[in-house]
Amino acid sequence: MTNAQLFLNNSWADKSETMSGSGSTLANTKAVREHLPLLLEKYNIESMFDAPCGDGNWIQHVDLTCAYTGGDLVQKFVDANPLQSVVFDITLGTFPAVDLWMCRACLYHLSNVEIQLAIDNFKQSNIKYALITSHTGNSGGDIRTGSFRVLNLEEHNYFGLDAPIDQIPDVLFNNMQENLLLFVNPRITK
């Protein structure tokens, strides 16, 4: 089964509001919707690539001050997204030329091998920043793609990322805080 098929068969989705899962409801994205525009302004972000973007349920309600493109494995999500989006695989695709890659609520559903592929793909791109979801708890072990585990990207220098330079709060889910950590691409100098 391909990753697209795994995520298309999303039994976890909150189908009353979004096909992208309960983490993409307006209630669960309140903090990120408030803090994301401030971060974009602080770092002079003029363009962003949101991958995976899901169906765009929450991002369409953000006051974006930059050019936006979404990318997702699932054609159905891309078609449903009211903002510009394309079919894209973060582990294989060539990232577009943008200032920021936002990877929200994704990596903790991927195996360690696929996470490393996505991070390496980012590091080989010309994107300056990556904004990636991380938990505050202790990381769980490796999983099969499509499952879930706690993933703390600040723990044990996971996947060769340098320490994050900033963060914004995301959602408190099952008594566990999720934040979006801002990383600088080591290939790009300031």
Regions from the PLM with identified roles:
Residues 102:
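A conserved beta-strand element that flanks and buttresses the S-adenosyl-L-methionine
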Residues 1-97, 110-190:
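Class I (Rossmann-like) S-adenosyl-L-methionine-dependent methyltransferase catalytic domain
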Residues 106:
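Hydrophobic adenine-recognition pocket in adenosine-nucleotide-binding enzymes
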